[in-house]
Amino acid sequence: MKYRSVLFVPGHEEKKIKKAYTLSADLIVLDLESTVPDDQKENAKKIITECNVNKNKTYIRVNSDLDLEFATKEKFLGILYFLL
């Protein structure tokens, strides 16, 4: 599928996550990588889960193997890997 618009959203900012799903982006990427401070990464996963996002239009950008485990368990549409 081709995406015309992709919106990246910091995974630890609940208000921005909720707002993203009211917009018309074709794909939303919830970021657990560089936009989330290290001390907020676990909290970001909790926020994403509690926001009950539309997983059929959501990718997760992961930072570590633990994030990858979370993304796989939650069954998001796709996963973007961290930068090397």
Where is each model-derived feature located?
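Expand to "…catalyze enediolate/carbanion chemistry for C-C bond making/breaking, isomerization
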Residues: 1-84
